[in-house]
Amino acid sequence: MILSLFGYGTLEISLVMEAVTGKSFHSTGAVLSDHARFLLPGETYPGIFRDYGSQVTGVLYEEVDRDSLALLDLFEGDFFRRERVQVMTPSQPRVDAYTYVVPAEHRLLFSTQPWDREVFILLHLKDFLPYCREFHWSQTRRLGMGLSSR
């Protein structure tokens, strides 16, 4: 089964996706309707929640394998829930994909400040990438991923 993932925050940055999963994926611009993206207070990353009439821009990663999805689930943690959504790309009006959504019961935890990709890249990416690489290294060893059996 071919899996697609909609990245809308730090995961829309291919360097972050590659650092977390250890792989690069083909990607294209995409839009998720009826959702809004805002910063989480005290954090440098955003979350999304259902908000009718709003749109979130991001990227659609294609052919994401199950091991990478398992790593992404761990990376996103318990605060985010992986959900199936439909996004639009320039060539396809409806594409099924997974994305990470903050559950409705946590909506009040959002700030009113929108997330800015360029600000994140300029101010935080340099420090965030080593964290992502360390996460990948520790989790792949813990889970036995990518290790040949002898």
Language model regions located:
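Glycine-aromatic micro-motifs
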Residues: 1-150
